[in-house]
Amino acid sequence: MRWAILPIAASLAFAADPADLVREAASGWTQAAVKQDAAGLERFLADDLQYAHAGGQTQNKREYIAAVTKGPARYESFTFSDQKVVLYGKAAVLTAFCDVKMVGRESFRVRTLQVYVENNGQWQMAAHQSTRVGR
């Protein structure tokens, strides 16, 4: 009996920390945005996404994916700092500073608040709000 429990205990010890999974989802979203990868964005964004840009423009999932993959503006990189994740069961709030670099434009810094939800084991961004801040 003691040996039967050992594999279960070992698998629990190596279970991924949900906060790390949220950070991985945030990283997956930024990588998909930089690559203009519609399938990647589909994976990391919740169907009922509400995305509010620093300038006040809001978009749903369909609008955001179209703008990122077909729009004239292209993301070059996102660099997060002071990133914090707070878990609320199957929801999480991520806050951070983010330096955003766009192709052919001056980079800028935002303070971002993102809400993630767990859908069938996959963490997805459900809401995003950012505000421009100085460096």
Predicted regions and their residues:
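Sec-dependent N-terminal signal peptides
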Residues: 3-13
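A beta-strand edge to alpha-helix "cap/lid" segment located at domain peripheries
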Residues: 16-43, 50-135
